[in-house]
């Protein structure tokens, strides 16, 4: 470990079936080590751990997040990083749901962990994994400050009309029912990067941001602040996702309960794990979906069409909500890598000043870039998200503030 290790932040992003991690210098953005634990709970689980020029891997079943994180710490040791003795600045944790309680980075205590666990009902795929990551990091790195950075925080100040559901007001107040929004760390980072890339004052920008990964969300941002977002009380609402279907008629749930005998747990499993692309096409990996489409699979093609249709519906809604748009940005795994999704989502919108340049859209450039024609009234961009850097900086600021 270098002498500058006291400036480094270990960032943990424990997802529903994965753990992403980076060892980051929050000042320079330099990444000393990084890796990904994939397909947790499946027979073909894998870890890729990168440290400088060296990469090591693990293949074989990883039963749960705890086992995955323990193996990650072993791989750090194998590549010469004694995290326990490194004098890290902090560990920063991405936490999906902060409810009404948390709307800024927070130093982790037992009470904070308990509160995050209580919100698991609202984010059942994510908060339990977040809690596991925090608990294991506290156990493996005692004495290192642990900071929770919440995905809901960016949307805490949504306008009342955007965050309020049209249900009984007393029930909503009693049970904390409102639109919270998610992927806020990414939406805040990317919308800020757009202003930097375009060299424009963010206060003057009207933006629509599509965060398209296994989870997917959209936001409308005016002057650096969100005015609407697609996810709601939970990460189930909005766009079509890998295993979540997004918007649906709530009457479907009552119908399934009466006609098929589905109880709450069965409905929860259906909506969180068996819907979306997986429910329609049998796969939740967009690369696999594309392969099936190329092979002529009709279900996969329909799933893709539903996915794009939902994107266009939110695009239209946010275009009106903003009163026009200056920049439309795609980010996250699908958003950054699928030229087809970007082109199809924005096809035929030239009358609105929205167009994609085919050559720019299919270029192999991995950085932030403009993909609209030079003279287009609306700038379309691809901007890689960097939630890890955003979390590292947030954790560093909190620790520095004492």
Swiss-Prot record:
GO CC terms in record: cytoplasm
CDD domains the UniProt entry points to: ASKHA_NBD_AcK_PK
Residues annotated as binding substrate: 94
Group of enzyme by EC: transferase
EC code: 2.7.2.1
Entry binding sites for Mg(2+): 13, 387
Catalytic activity: acetate + ATP = acetyl phosphate + ADP
Annotated GO MF terms: acetate kinase activity; ATP binding; magnesium ion binding
An individual GO BP term: acetyl-CoA biosynthetic process
Superkingdom, taxonomy of origin: Bacteria
Subcellular location: Cytoplasm
Known pathway: Metabolic intermediate biosynthesis; acetyl-CoA biosynthesis; acetyl-CoA from acetate: step 1/2
Active site: 151
InterPro entries in the cross-refs: Ac/propionate_kinase, Aliphatic_acid_kin_short-chain, Aliphatic_acid_kinase_CS, ATPase_NBD
Comment on bound cofactor: Mg(2+). Can also accept Mn(2+).
Entry keyword annotation includes Ribosomal protein: no
UniProt keyword annotations, A-Z: ATP-binding, Cytoplasm, Kinase, Magnesium, Metal-binding, Nucleotide-binding, Transferase
Essential cofactor(s): Mg(2+); Mn(2+)
Entry function: Catalyzes the formation of acetyl phosphate from acetate and ATP. Can also catalyze the reverse reaction.
Similarity comment text for this entry: Belongs to the acetokinase family.
HAMAP family listed in its UniProt record: Acetate_kinase
Subunit and partners: Homodimer.
Name of this protein: Acetate kinase
Annotated source species: Nocardia farcinica (strain IFM 10152)
Source organism phylogeny: Bacteria, Bacillati, Actinomycetota, Actinomycetes, Mycobacteriales
């Amino acid at each position: 470990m270098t002498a500058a290790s006291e400036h480094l932040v270990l960032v943990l992003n424990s997802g529903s079936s994965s753990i992403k991690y980076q060892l980051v210098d929050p000042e320079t953005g330099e990444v000393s080590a990084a890796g990904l634990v994939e397909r947790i709970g499946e027979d073909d689980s894998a870890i890729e751990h990168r440290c400088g020029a060296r990469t090591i891997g693990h293949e074989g079943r990883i039963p749960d997040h705890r086992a995955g994180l323990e193996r990650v710490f072993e791989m750090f040791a194998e590549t010469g990083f004694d995290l326990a003795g490194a004098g890290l600045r902090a560990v920063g944790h991405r936490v999906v749901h902060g409810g009404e309680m948390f709307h800024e980075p927070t130093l982790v205590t037992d009470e904070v962990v308990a509160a995050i666990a209580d919100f698991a009902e609202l984010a059942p795929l994510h908060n339990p994994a977040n809690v596991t990551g925090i608990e294991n990091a506290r156990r493996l790195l005692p004495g290192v400050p642990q900071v929770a950075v919440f995905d809901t925080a960016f949307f805490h100040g949504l306008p009342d009309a955007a965050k309020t559901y049209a249900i009984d007001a007393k029930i909503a107040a009693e049970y904390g029912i409102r639109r919270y929004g998610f992927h806020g760390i990414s939406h805040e980072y990317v919308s800020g990067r757009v202003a930097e890339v375009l060299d424009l004052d963010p206060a003057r920008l009207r933006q629509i941001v599509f965060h398209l990964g296994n989870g997917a969300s959209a936001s409308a941002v005016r002057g650096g602040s969100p005015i609407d977002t697609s996810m709601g009380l939970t990460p189930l609402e909005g766009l079509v996702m890998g295993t979540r279907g997004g918007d649906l008629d709530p009457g479907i749930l009552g119908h399934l309960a009466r006609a098929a005998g589905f109880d709450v747990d069965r409905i929860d499993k259906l909506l969180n794990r068996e819907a979306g692309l997986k429910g329609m096409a049998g796969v939740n990996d967009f690369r696999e979906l594309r392969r099936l489409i190329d092979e002529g699979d009709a279900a996969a093609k329909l799933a893709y069409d539903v996915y794009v249709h939902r994107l266009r519906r939110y695009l239209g809604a946010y275009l009106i909500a903003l009163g026009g748009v200056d920049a439309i940005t795609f980010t996250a795994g699908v958003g950054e890598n699928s030229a087809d999704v970007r082109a199809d989502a924005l096809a035929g919108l030239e009358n609105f000043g929205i167009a994609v340049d085919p050559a720019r859209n299919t270029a192999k450039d991995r950085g932030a870039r403009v993909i609209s024609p030079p003279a287009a009234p609306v700038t379309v961009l691809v901007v890689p998200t960097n939630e890890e850097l955003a979390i590292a900086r947030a954790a560093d600021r909190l620790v520095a503030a004492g």
